[in-house]
């Protein structure tokens, strides 16, 4: 593991931005993530020391592999596309309701600027429930992978569009070595091929283009049927009805990640039952 993470992070940022042909939302988000990371960074030696006392893992893959459609329920205050979604003063209370409703994994946004999430949300939620927890963020450095394990993330998100091929491979390998499951997110067939090439067990198909924020359900139709049965397929973004859940299930999805319709619901337990037709 590398000591000079700050230099690595900034080198990554400059190199990654040079790859982009035009300004987009994802570039802006990654810039902010790296800036915020510098404010909380501790020496990598101390982070490695904290790994020794990291919480026991809960097995997100196992939880999502149960028969029937599974749910990753997300705690999300805001988004770049919709702005403010819900006032969530107590993330752990909402997580408890998700657990009561039958969610299988709780997704916690930790990105601060666009999604109004926080690391403290992740810690609070994991300490208040028994379900596995997904750290939903823009992971673009090795430091964040290590940090995620220290914080207690059972599942970590790696977005193919935000990483070089070597970073995707290295971060995936490190995550699995640390015992975490990995949700590898793709937006097109080329990204899906990259996810398969590194041996991804869980692949999330996001119908939202992170560069333009546009949503197209055709993304599900294009990618989900092309993924092998051995992969645990997750449908992400733009899903708010039971009919949509049933449709992506027919396309091969074994789980859905839903946030907006749940955080805006006055009764998330009831909403979960409606979405999953229970």
Tell what function each PLM region has.
Residues 7-133, 140, 174, 180-199, ...:
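Conserved N-terminal beta1-alpha1 strand-loop-helix module at the mouth
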Residues 102, 128-131, 150-156, 176-180, ...:
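Glycine-enriched alpha-helix->loop->beta-strand junction motifs that scaffold or abut catalytic
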Residues 122-125, 171, 223, 275:
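Aromatic/hydrophobic pocket-lining residues that form π-stacking "cages" and hydrophobic walls in ligand
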Residues 140-151, 190-198, 240-256:
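Catalytic cores of alpha/beta
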Residues 145-162, 168, 174:
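A short alpha/beta connector and helix-capping loop motif
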Residues 152-163, 205-212, 253-271:
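Glycine-rich phosphate-binding active-site loops on the catalytic face of alpha/beta enzymes
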Residues 202-251, 256-258:
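Catalytic-face loop-and-helix region of soluble metabolic enzyme cores
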Residues 222-226, 264-278:
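C-terminal helical cap(s) of enzyme catalytic domains, especially alpha/beta-barrels
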